[in-house]
Amino acid sequence: VKSFERPQTGERAVLVRLGLGTPVDTEDLQEFRQLATSAGAIPVATVTGRRDRPDPRYFMGSGKAEELRDVAVANEAEVVLVDHALSPSQERNLEKLTGRRVLDRSGLILDIFAQRARSFEGKLQVELAQLKHISTRLVRGWTHLERQSGGIGMRGPGETQLETDRRLIGQRVKILTKRLEKITQQRETGRQARAEIPVPSLALVGYTNAGKSTLFRSWTGADAYVADQLFATLDPTVRRITLPGGTLVVGADTVGFIRELPHELVAAFQSTLTEAREATLLLHVIDASDARRDEHIAQVDAVLAEIGAENIPQILVYNKIDRLAVQPRIDRNADGQATAVWISAEKRLGLDLLAAAVAERLTRFARKARIRIQPSGGAVRSRLYEAKAVRAEHPGEDGSSELDVELPDVELMTLARTPGVQILDVPGTPLPESLAFQASPPVKSAAGDF
């Protein structure tokens, strides 16, 4: 699928950012400049302004739009990048006025994702998101699309180019959706196979450019792509990690988040983000040197909630402490539980503390529980005995077993997602929300309570 018949895109860009009811936020503008640079653009000028509300025609007022046109001409800009979500009509009107291609924030992020995707799945996800975004912006021809298709007597010369474009996009969306469904099924099959012998899993999440991939590479030795740019990583990398004490976990590096992440991308990357949604523990990596780190934490948590990962336990990992006068350390809550670790992945400072904190979260604060394992779950049963987590076993007449175990919440969560395993009861303390969906009412048995 080729591009629109629009003014040709180049690298020289004018950036646009308005303050809606407030002055322009310089930090937001700087982040948008980073986005533009990450996309390969060369910012040559910036147009800012302030309005109470967006203008229906240009988003900005007509006077500011004319100023934008003059700035673009004077600086020989070839593209206009707007740090807001534009409606299709606003985008078209600005293109007609300026004679330049216009991309809003969503379009720019989609373009970056298109450049960064390396795996077959990642490329399909990005293309699907782009087509859904573009489909709302069709006005006149993608004249270089594939030839018109249609059966005899079905679609003749009366079909307009716009109708053809919409139909071809619709067909491509269906094809991509089916391919991604197959990949998702394959990924789920692999995940279920790993779950047969449950191993705790970690997912690195965080705001883009917080240093997740640097940490992942420093910690695991994995060949994860590292660059000082936004969205350097799109495709998840999964590796085994051995923690202090010999505990084996699976770690996954995931795509970074950002404010106003286009909904099309969140939807398209659902299967990839499953690595975070189904993790035992999240390592929420934060740029400790960023003045807006608390805002970034909130924005990442909002995306985690959108994908259904808000109840997964977290350790906050404050990275890049080499830029601050801060020593590596572990922060704890009132119960003594490790809640945050301060490190520098690039300088390899505090990585031992992080590994210790993760191992601690996976092994400390155990609670008693009763679980039922079906006859097919022999590997799970063996692993629980090897971990010395079994306190008693009560064989069932159907070949299943009820085990009284003592495990931390994060490992109970792993068991709750394991085929052939059912959480029956966690007495004495409230059941975590993450386990409640799996639990059954307490079962009376001859074995009695524990």
Which residues are covered by each model-predicted region?
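Switch I (effector-binding) loop of TRAFAC-class P-loop GTPase G-domains
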Residues: 1, 187, 193-200, 218-250, ...
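C-terminal-of-GTPase-core extension/linker across diverse P-loop GTPases
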Residues: 1-19, 28, 33, 132, ...
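N-terminal accessory targeting/assembly segments
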Residues: 1-105, 109-110, 423-424, 429-450
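Flexible beta-alpha connector loops of hexameric P-loop NTPases
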Residues: 19-24, 53-58, 116-121, 161, ...
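Conserved C-terminal guanine-recognition region of P-loop GTPase G domains, centered on the G4
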Residues: 27-38, 42, 65-74, 79, ...
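Short, acidic/turn-prone active-site loops that include or flank metal/cofactor-
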Residues: 106-110, 230-231, 346-347
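Short alpha-helix plus adjacent loop in nuclease-associated cores
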Residues: 107-128
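Short, charged, surface-exposed secondary-structure boundary motifs
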Residues: 111-116, 235, 351-353, 433-435
